[in-house]
């Protein structure tokens, strides 16, 4: 089990893991802490999923030359740890939106005009490359409004979990 962080245009991942109190959890449990864009190998999507790429609804149009995904994820079990919040493009976030951040690089914003089709393509990719996928959603606080950055927080004190990435 290891913790993985992507690169984002919103906040530095190193700052985020400190401010969100993720580092103490990683350290307490002796997990390897991996920043996917620092020394990790990435592979071309066609090398990872083969002919499945021909079935993508939109990613081939958005990325005509293809795109790279983290090699580390191939054959791995994945546990997504999303939070409950709204999103201006997808209505809500969750495990599927987590895959968006984990499988696509920082140019992923080019998929926003076709975000729902992108999430379907990412589900296909996850089913192909991961041995298992599970999500535990933190609903201690839930975000409402024009998220993910400008939300009104609400205390909800719930935790949701499922192997169904669409449901969670």
Where does each model-flagged region fall?
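Extended, low-polarity segments enriched in aliphatic/aromatic residues
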Residues: 1-168
């Amino acid at each position: 089990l290891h913790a993985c962080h992507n690169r984002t245009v919103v906040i530095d991942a190193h700052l985020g893991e400190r401010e969100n109190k993720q580092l103490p959890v990683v350290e307490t449990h002796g997990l390897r802490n991996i920043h996917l864009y620092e020394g990790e190998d990435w592979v071309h999507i066609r090398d990872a999923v083969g002919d499945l790429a021909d079935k993508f609804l939109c990613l081939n149009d958005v990325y005509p030359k293809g795109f790279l995904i983290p090699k580390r994820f191939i054959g791995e079990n994945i546990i997504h740890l999303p939070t409950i919040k709204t999103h201006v493009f997808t209505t809500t976030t969750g495990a599927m939106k987590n895959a968006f951040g984990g499988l696509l690089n920082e140019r992923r914003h080019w998929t926003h005009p076709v975000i729902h089709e992108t999430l379907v393509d990412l589900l296909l990719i996850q089913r192909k490359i991961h041995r298992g996928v599970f999500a535990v959603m933190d609903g201690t606080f839930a975000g409402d409004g024009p998220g993910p950055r400008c939300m009104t927080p609400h205390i909800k004190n719930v935790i949701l979990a499922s192997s169904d990435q669409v449901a969670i």
